[in-house]
A protein has these predicted regions:
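Short alpha-helix within the catalytic core of nucleotide-sugar-dependent glycosyltransferases
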Residues: 33, 123, 136-145
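Short, well-formed alpha-helical segments that are part of the catalytic scaffolds
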Residues: 2-7, 22-49, 63-69, 84-87
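Long helical/loop segments within the catalytic core of UDP-sugar-dependent glycosyltransferases
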Residues: 93, 99-116, 139-208, 309-318
Length: 349
């Protein structure tokens, strides 16, 4: 599928700090860096302090002083000075800075990176993104333009499987992920924009919560009222059987702690759909396949994997039972033991 048509934005009303956690320099870094605008786009004059590589982190985790608050910026956030992306220090594109977040303690590496990025960001308007999808040339302009009429705005993810198990999960992710983000007031950390004052309990409380939990976008949803743009992004998912299984466990655990009632509903729905497919196979398979097909059509997902919805429904109860029984999961090279919303320990893999 292709991304939905973005909103055109000839001018930008406020400079944006884009936070991109990654341990490697990827195409996404270049894509976003190419979209940054200097002070001249906001009525100011360019200055030498915001030149190429200005303000990049020196490896201590502290900010450089070259950030220009009257311009867009990209903060590339890694865990350690030893991460491959840190080799770009001193050779960064214009208005790009490197931030070293440090090893996470009592939270996920992603949440820790976002908290560090929020501290380091020079602007009040902040966008989060990830490195696992393509950012077209007007990605940032469209997201920024959406903020003016909507306030905090998120785009909508479509998870595209890279291995057989990930492709098997696609119908479930379309219904429980794509559709849920679109209509449920859920922030997707891959493409969301907001201002610091939009955080209901203030930024300090938000950063404190990030540093004691796992899910960055789940935590943002707890602190922010957000609406979804009618625009999707294809997100690469999986690549190995084990990685896709760990992702499924992580996703279900996130909803378990951030939306327990929704999780209970999903479990009951999964059991009901499986029972229907077993007891009335013709009607059950037709209903489940039609539901998945309707969601695919709504979001322009041009993939045949909606036909896997019925087999997925049959396997949903044992898969959910497995995920709920798991006490740990692996994400980004770390094992997390997530006991409750704000009780997380990080263990070696």
């Amino acid at each position: 599928m292709t991304d939905s048509e973005p909103t055109s934005a000839a001018t930008r009303s406020a400079p944006v700090s884009v936070l991109l956690p990654t341990v490697r320099w990827t195409d996404a870094c270049d894509e976003v860096a190419d979209q940054l605008r200097g002070p001249e786009a906001f009525g100011g004059a360019d200055n030498a302090g915001a030149g190429e590589g200005a303000g990049d982190d020196a490896g201590s985790g502290d900010d450089g002083d070259g950030a220009d608050p009257a311009a867009d910026e990209l903060l590339v956030i890694c865990d350690s000075p030893d991460d491959p992306v840190a080799e770009r220090r001193g050779d960064l594109p214009e208005r790009v800075r490197l931030r070293v977040a440090g090893e996470p303690e009592g939270c996920s590496g992603k949440a820790n990176a976002i908290a560090a990025g929020m501290e380091a960001a020079a602007n009040d308007r902040v966008a989060w993104t990830d490195d696992d999808f393509h950012h077209p040339p007007d990605w940032l302009a469209a997201l920024d333009a959406d903020y003016e009429p909507r306030g905090p705005t998120t785009e909508v993810p479509v998870f595209v499987g890279l291995d057989p198990l990930a492709r098997f999960f696609e119908p479930a992710y379309a219904i429980g992920g794509t559709l849920a983000v679109s209509v449920g007031g859920i922030a997707w950390g891959g493409a969301v924009i907001f201002e610091r004052d939009d955080l209901r309990d203030g930024e300090a409380a938000f950063r404190r919560d990030l540093r004691r939990t796992v899910s960055d976008d789940g935590t943002l949803t707890e602190h922010l009222d957000v609406t979804a743009a009618d625009r999707t992004r294809d997100v690469r998912a999986g690549g190995s059987f084990r990685g896709s299984l760990e992702r499924f466990v992580r996703f279900l655990t996130i909803t378990r702690y951030h939306a327990p009632l929704a999780t209970a509903f999903n479990v009951l729905l999964g059991v009901s759909m499986a029972a229907l497919c077993l007891l009335a196979p013709v009607a059950g398979v037709a209903l489940v396949t039609a539901l998945a097909g309707a969601v695919y059509a709504r979001f322009g997902i041009d993939r045949a994997t909606f036909l896997l919805a019925a087999p997925g429904a049959l396997l949903a109860p044992p898969l959910m039972a497995y995920a709920l029984a798991r006490r740990t999961f692996v994400w980004g090279g770390r094992r997390y033991r997530w006991r409750s919303l704000f009780d997380v320990s990080v263990e070696p893999v």
